[in-house]
Amino acid sequence: MIVTFISQCEKKAIPRTRRVLDAFADRIGDNTWQTVITEDGLVAVKNLLRKTASKNTAVSCHRIATRRRTELVWIVGNRSKFNHKGIVPVNFTTKELFMDLPLETKTILANTHGQPLSQHLFAVGYLAHQIIEHLKIDNNNIAQSAFIAGILHDIGKLDPQFQQWLSKKLDKSDENIILPEDGVHIDTSIRGFKDFSFEDHPRHNEISWLLAESLLANSKNPQINQIFHGIYWHHTRPYRKDDKFFNKAEGIDKKFKNSLTEITLEKVTDQLVAVLNDIQRIGKNFKNDEFNFENLAPKWSYTYQLTKNDLPNYKIYNDLSEKISEFVSDIQPNALNNLVRMAVISADRVVSVMSAEDLNEYLIEGTLHHALDNILQDNTQLSNHIRLCIDGFKQKYPDSERNIIQTKAALELANLKENAEFDESSNVAVLQGPAGCGKTKIALEWALRTDVQKIIWVCPRVQVCLGLLHDLTEADYLPNSRIEIFTGEYKKILQNGVTFDTAPETQTNEYFTGDIIITTIDQVINNIISHQKVTGMIDFMQAHVVFDEFHELIPMPAFNLFFAELIEAKKMKKHLANTLLVSATPHDYFVENILKIDSG
């Protein structure tokens, strides 16, 4: 472990303490030491300090627990020189500190990590907004919708039954808390809450949607439906034996109100107002050129009123649709829903794994955006590897007409990015060519010329994936890149001459980490339709994407619509869409009339 020692010793205790600590650690300041040490070594240091301790001795030891947090291990000597966390007091104030939450809301919690609900809601809303911004989605309304959905996604946790259950859950929980994949909900692990499980009581996301409908009753936001969809569907909808109370607002409202025994609806409303005021106060600390809470937050309608709107459908395609134009008109709204939901769930997961202390520090320091460092795309060596590949072909076949034609095609495709930026259109292109013409090499050179960091190569069938994997790992192509195959049956990463047969199965935490990920359309669609994998859509939105043999997707019911949603989402990145549709026989009607792409 890495530890830091702080000395607040006085008089003769100073040299005695220094002799001990100098023997075990590096002095990094007049009164500070740091070292890597074992548990046994740390015990030895403590015992030696105790042997020489006097009333003037005061030494604290802190362990570096995480990248952002240290923990007090022990104090030897005069404990009054430090506070209970081992911090040296230097001043005091009678003013309210920025993150001192009012008494009425500081005990309203979001999860078993003890995060205050106000802080949790703001953090999720802020990070959801930042995700949309980082993905370069050219739609300010989407970023605002993600923010509003984020700050309201768990507002239903004001439910008194949830707060009572959570309080008792925290009393009996150990320190190593693992949050469930589908969030924290009332369950029967605590005695006395059987009547408030999901079978008989609304889940917090259902109550959140109900309250949000009331809060935004007067909103003029043109994308209000994306907000409600993101709130309601940030958790999966549970299967209930009797769903009659939970498939409409009136039933959820009735179940919720009937559960209010000791606390009135007016009291819940007062708490809601207080939490939203907290969120506004926190938001002022994050004001900058890209984020202004006052411009993003709507005008709330605080008087509770039961909505007459239906619950948000997961997909809004109409069962009665018969004309192609009817389906096409629903593609963009579904794509918008996907993006808002992706941002809210991803932000929620990032925030929920933090300790309450870490979250509080992020908010005090105004550095919450750094929490996204692990999910945003890193720079890779892929472009260098592709350049070596292309140069190798030119050196091996210096006067090859085939190479010249392929480079010309790649250059024409790459130039579409500049044209799209000038025209403010989307950089989604179609590459048509007969089998054996080198479409794979053209696609790689196109990626190189458009600043590639990662490629997600989507195939209609596993057999196509395996063929592509074989080609890309050949010595002439990208033997040193991390080429990942990710299908239902095969999950491997090949690099530096490792063969398919000898490569081990990819560990779960390594999924989608390759420089090039070869996968099937069903795996990519899972990023849309499943709650567990929706955060993988962030990878999809950041990467260069190649849809290989995409014409095979068009006759597949449902898949063709999901495919269209994916393309629509990428188109929202405008010239940064970096998406290529590859086929020997592209379906011109589908491309032009469904995907709305100029196939020329």
Describe these PLM feature segments:
Residues A143-Q144, D423, Q507-G514, S530-A543:
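Short basic/glycine-enriched coil/helix segment immediately N-terminal to the Walker B
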Residues F422-A447, V582-S583:
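Walker A/P-loop
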